[in-house]
Amino acid sequence: MNIEVEMKVLDERMADVVPVYATEGSAGLDLRACLDEEVVLQPGETFLVPTGLAIYLANPAYAAVLLPRSGLGHKHGIVLGNLVGLIDSDYQGELKVSLWNRSSEPFTVKPFERIAQMVVVPIVQAGFKRVEEFVGSSRGEGGFGSTGSH
């Protein structure tokens, strides 16, 4: 299933590096840092990185999620400050990525470096019905770890 997403290039330096799917099977599109100069993230520090791009999904049946790039997280301890970014279908502002250095070493974010990936996902908006009791289930109120270890 494909949808058309409107995209604005807010900084012309990003015009040649707009997000594209790297392969036919790619789920995510890489987002890049729209920076004038390198930014050093100290251990434990967060920084809100502009991308120079805005998108408009328009259709409430879709949203976009921003996720860490696996290599940055595994090799350098760089993840998203909010763990997952959610872009609602009606948002039209600049995409920004909160980077968090959870490592013990400084990390340098370079201009135009790939910093996160964006995945467009289908959304279901639930309607809620208030009840006094739930119909029983085998799990009941069992929470964390209640289904056993595998």
UniProtKB/Swiss-Prot annotation:
Coiled-coil intervals in this record? Answer: none
Q: Which InterPro entries match?
A: dUTPase, dUTPase-like, dUTPase-like_sf, dUTPase_trimeric
State any GO BP term from the record.
dUTP catabolic process
Recite the UniProt keywords alphabetically: Hydrolase, Magnesium, Metal-binding, Nucleotide metabolism
Annotated metabolic or biological route of this protein: Pyrimidine metabolism; dUMP biosynthesis; dUMP from dCTP (dUTP route): step 2/2
One Pfam family hit: dUTPase
Q: Which Gene3D superfamilies match?
A: 2.70.40.10
Family membership, please give it: Belongs to the dUTPase family.
Cofactor(s) needed: Mg(2+)
User: What Enzyme Commission number(s) does the record list for this chain?
Assistant: 3.6.1.23
What HAMAP family does UniProt report for this protein, alphabetically? Answer: dUTPase_bact (MF_00116)
The protein's name: Deoxyuridine 5'-triphosphate nucleotidohydrolase
Binding positions for substrate per the UniProt entry = R69, S70, G71, N82, L86, I87, D88, K96
Q: Which organism's genome codes for this protein? A: Neisseria meningitidis serogroup B (strain ATCC BAA-335 / MC58)
Gene Ontology MF terms: dUTP diphosphatase activity; magnesium ion binding
Q: What does this protein do?
A: This enzyme is involved in nucleotide metabolism: it produces dUMP, the immediate precursor of thymidine nucleotides and it decreases the intracellular concentration of dUTP so that uracil cannot be incorporated into DNA.
What reaction does this catalyse? dUTP + H2O = dUMP + diphosphate + H(+)
